[in-house]
Amino acid sequence: MIIYLEGNIGSGKSTLIQFLQEYILEKKIDADVILEPVEEWQKTQDSNETNILQHYYQDQKKFGFAFQINALLSRVKKVEDQIKKSKHSVHFIERSIFTDKNVFLEANYQTGNITEIE
């Protein structure tokens, strides 16, 4: 079973997830938590060691598409990898690919940060 944890930026997802992780360990629940792959975004750097997340926040129009594709692909890979190696039957996942497409990609399109073809 997969349960996605969604919410606006700054809504308390990280706090909830931290509590959930501690509770799962304490109660020995057959579940795990898969966090958003922020560390992967921070590893994707140019020759100046500026990562893709920093680039996105500095110039959303220029890096909007590159960041959203990177976010989507890294999320899919992390979820697939962790579920394959997990022994648990329940997975709590921070954000879903549906949020990447229907919220962040759409918001970037509506604000002109990415084009229709992108």
Residue ranges and their predicted role:
Residues E22-Q68:
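Conserved substrate/cofactor phosphate-moiety recognition/catalytic segment
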Residues N8:
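P-loop (Walker A) phosphate-binding loop of NTP-binding proteins
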Residues I52-F92:
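PAPS-dependent sulfotransferase catalytic domain
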Residues K13:
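Conserved lysine of the Walker
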Residues L16, L20:
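Hydrophobic positions on the alpha1 helix immediately C-terminal to the Walker A/P-loop
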Residues V79-E118:
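ATP-dependent NMP and nucleoside kinases share a basic, alpha-helical "lid"
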Residues I3-L5:
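Hydrophobic anchor at the beta1->P-loop junction of P-loop NTPases
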Residues M1, A31, S89-V90:
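The start of beta-strands in P-loop NTPase/AAA+ ATPase cores
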